[in-house]
Amino acid sequence: MADVTSDYECAVIDEIQMLGCKTRGFSFTRALLGIAADELHLCGDAAAVPLIQELLKVTGDDVQVRSYERLLPLVPLEVPLGSFSNIRTGDCIVSFSRKGIYKLKKKIETGGKHLCSVVYGSLPPETRTRQARMFNDASSEFDVLVAGDAIGMGLNLNISRIIFSTMKKFDGLERRDLTLPEVKQIAGRAGRYGSKYPMGEVTCLDAEDLPLLHSSLKSASPTLQQAGIFPSFDFIYMYSRLQQKRGLYQILEDFLENAKLSENYFFANCEEMLKVAAVIDELPLSLQDKYLFCISPVDMDDEISSQGLTQFAENYAKKGLVRLKEIFSPGSLQVPKTHSALKELESIHKVLELYVWLSFRLDELFPDHELASSQKVICSMLIEEFLERLGFQNPTSRKLNSLMAKKRRQYL
C-alpha cells in the first residue's frame, strides 16, 4: 500500500487505470487521493483520464494531460502459433491458470529446443523478479517465458512475441472472455522500448481466438466510469456505534449494504475481508485489531494461508505476543520435489509474508520480523531451484548443472 503519511516532492503511480479494478482498484484510488506530493505523475491508459479529472475537481488539483505514442510498433499476426514447434527465443506464452502454465512449460521443454522461465501471481515477488531476470539474460538458456496475467504488472521483459494460449479466464465467478483492457495490457508487453527487439508481435495459440484478439487491439478502451474505494476503520468504527453488540462481519455487511456513494465510486470487492471477519469474530479482540487482520494480505481460499492467519489472531488474542516459532520451524524448508509440494511452499511463503506485514504494524507484538524475512528469502530461493530443475528434465548442458550447484551452495 502506498505511503500516505509522508510528504514527497514527486511521486509516480503506474497503471493508474487499475483504479477501476473490482478487487484492487481501491488501493490505486487511495494512492491517487492520499499521496502528499507536490507533483504526482500518473501513467496508464487514457481511458482513465476523464474519471481522474472528475475526481480531482473535488480536491482542487491542477491536472495536466500529456499523451505519448508507443515508441515501437505492436503487430497483431494474421496466423496463430498452431504448433509448439513454432516457439522461438523471446516468446512469451500466456495462460490464466497455474496448472495451465506448468502444462505449457512441459510441452515446450519436451521439444528439446527451449527452457522456460515462469511468472504468475502466487509466486513470491522475489522469485518472479529472478525468473524475469533469467529470461532477459541473453546468456541464459531460459529463452522462453510462460506467464499468467501477472506479466502485465511491474516487470520489464525482453519479449518479442506474446502468444495467448486462450482468450478466456476464470475470474473467480465465471469463465469469461478477456476484457479489452486485459488484452491490451498483456499484448503491449511485446517489443517494449529499450528491449532488443525492433517491434512487438502478438498472436494466439489457436486460430479461433484471433478475431477477439484483433478486434480488441483495434478498439479504443472504454472510458472508466467509477473508481474503487474501501471503507476505512474510522468509517467502520463510527458505524459500529450504531450497531451495538454486533460482530465485525455483521457491521461490515450492513455498512456495505447501506452506504451511499457518489456516482464516481464503487466499493471494491470485500469478499476476502468478510471471510476473515467470519473467522476471527469470536476472538476477544478489539474492533480495530479485527479490522487490521481483515485488511491483511491473506488468501482465505488457501488452506495453509488461512490457517496461518487464524493461528496468528488466536495467539495475539490469548497472549498479546505472537512468536513465529510457535507455528513454524526454521530449518524445515526443503526444495520441493512435486508440484503439490511447490504449491505448499508457495503457501508457506504467504504465511511468512503475512507475519512480516503484521510485524510492521504491531512490531513489539510480532517481534520475529528478521526471522520471518530471512525464511521468506529462503522460501523463494527453494522455489527458484525447483523451477530451474523443471527445465532439466531433458539432457542438460554443463553450464546449467554448474548454475544449479552454485545456487545450492548459496542456500547453505
Task: Put a short name on every predicted segment.
Residues 39-49, 139-140, 157-218:
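Conserved segment of the helicase C-terminal RecA-like domain
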Residues 103, 117-148:
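Conserved helicase ATPase core of P-loop NTP-dependent helicases/translocases
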Residues 1-5, 138-156:
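Conserved two-lobed SF2 helicase motor
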Residues 41-43, 48-50, 84-112, 116-120, ...:
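Conserved strand-helix element at the start of the C-terminal RecA-like helicase core
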Residues 231-412:
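Non-catalytic terminal extensions of ATP-dependent helicases
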Residues 10, 17-73:
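Post-DEXD/H (motif II) to motif III coupling segment of the RecA-like Helicase ATP-binding lobe
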Residues 23-27, 34, 68-110, 135:
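Conserved interdomain hinge at the start of the Helicase C-terminal
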Residues 14-16, 165-166:
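Walker B catalytic acidic pair
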